[in-house]
Amino acid sequence: MSVEIERVHSLERMIFKSVRSTEEKLNYVRNNQPVLLVAFKENKPVGFKLGYVIPGTQTLFSWLGGVHSLHRRSGIGQHLLERQEALARDMGLDKIYFTSYDRYKPMIRLGEKNGYELIKAETDAGEMKYWYQKNLCSGVLG
């Protein structure tokens, strides 16, 4: 899967009004089984999720994503999350995790609503940072 820096930066600007990813980080993502999903409405991007497989594990890190403010609360984030989980399962992965901060309460609520469990919390630059994880092999002994 191709993860083009210009495309990711365009999506970031649309959602966050600024660019957070670096060329170095995107190169890392590109080299670790990236999963990039983009949601469109009327042929225009309105949301995205970008993740990658953590080397040496069967875990997908859902690293970056969001939905444009004009399109929130319409099910787009839920659809992206479900599709990312399905792709991770298809890839044979057994876990998916994400991090979030207090300022992204909707992301935290979406994760909790979908069975993600809080596995760690600590202060990062004066703000609480949370790690959430979901076992994709529910009901399977492993």
Regions found by a protein language model. Give the residues of each.
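Conserved GNAT acetyl-CoA-binding A-motif
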Residues: A88-S100
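Conserved beta-strand in the GNAT
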Residues: V38, K44-V53, T59-G66
